[in-house]
A protein has these predicted regions:
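Active-site microenvironment for binding and transforming phosphate-containing groups
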Residues: 1-317
Length: 317
């Protein structure tokens, strides 16, 4: 099994966290809580074979890039992570969470149809299986990684404006609690590169939706710019939801990288269309005394009721 080789460590002044850069051939930004127990990383746009607006590590199969290039890019990323296949959600801006068991591990890797068949209308995934590379694809929306070191469980969520207002992050936290017994106080959270507050201007109708979802607190997430327009602080909205879910602020690590102004390293749909997609990945590592699960099996057997969640999305309450 391959291991990520850390070449350097950079300090990101705006967030106060350290971002490690891994392998010059396929650079990955690593969340501070990544360890020998869990991989928690974000890709950049470098290290692949795509060209033009998709150059070069485009992982999205739905944006107009050649399928052969996307397949090779996914193969390269999987190899760098030490797995055979990525597990990729369908992503339709919902608050639906899928519990990934042995039957779902590695689904979505083969393209859009594979993702839609395995994870229809799903924007978050959770698992307690090792060696499952949960993968979310983004280009301005916030990729969020969740890790419970106590229960040894992990998750990823696609949290753009629509998904955030629908509550995809609170739903993912609830799903981890219901499925694995995860306590919010134990969760370590990584917010990857996303469109920054100053770059994300929305209209009056969208601003009204923010106010409806957050109430009076919504005024602190919106900054008027001109008549009928305001900027929206997506990352702050996610942090507010995490706080409301009882996740300690010290457990939240925001890379604070604006994709709209950081197009040298990341794709941004607002900056250029068409464009590719980069990824956030969470992958639990196998314990030294842990045997691989049999194909099609699940570890979700702590409670008979939880077995009903196998291979089925957990939908919002």
């Amino acid at each position: 099994m391959s291991h990520l080789h850390i070449l350097s460590q950079q300090h990101h002044a705006s967030s106060g966290i350290r971002v490690r850069v891994v392998s010059p051939d396929l650079p990955l930004r690593v969340f501070p809580f990544a360890s020998d127990q869990v991989t928690a990383v974000v890709t950049t746009r470098h290290g692949g074979v795509s060209t033009g607006p998709y150059g070069s590590l485009n992982l999205g199969g739905h944006v107009g890039d050649g399928p052969e290039a996307v397949a090779e890019n996914r193969r390269r990323l999987a190899a760098a992570l030490g797995v055979d296949r990525l597990t990729i959600a369908d992503q339709k801006h919902t608050a639906t969470v899928a519990v990934v068991d042995g039957a779902l591990a590695g689904r979505g890797h083969d393209g859009v149809a594979d993702s839609a068949a395995a994870f229809p209308g799903t924007d978050a995934m959770i698992t307690d299986l090792p060696d499952v590379a949960l993968t979310i694809l983004v280009a301005d929306c916030a990729p969020v990684v969740l890790y419970d070191p106590v229960r040894r469980a992990a998750g990823v969520a696609h949290s753009g404006r629509v998904g955030t207002l629908k509550g995809v992050i609170p739903q993912t936290i609830k799903a981890m609690a219901a499925t694995f017994g995860s306590a919010p106080a134990d969760l370590l959270i990584g917010i990857g590169p996303a469109i920054g507050a100053a770059s994300y201007e929305i209209g009056a109708a969208e601003a009204a939706e923010v106010m409806a979802a957050f109430g009076e607190a919504g005024t602190r997430l919106l900054t008027p710019t001109r008549p009928g327009r305001a900027t929206f602080d997506l990352a702050a909205a996610i942090r507010r939801q995490l706080a409301a879910a009882a996740v300690p602020a010290g457990n939240v690590h925001d890379m604070a990288i604006d994709t709209r102004t950081g197009t040298d390293d990341f794709f941004s749909d607002r900056a250029a269309r068409p464009c590719g997609r980069f990824a956030a990945i969470a992958r639990l590592h196998r314990a030294a005394d842990e045997s691989p699960p049999r194909a099609g099996t699940s570890v979700l057997t702590r409670s008979p009721a939880l077995t009903l969640l196998k291979s089925k999305p957990l939908r919002p309450a």
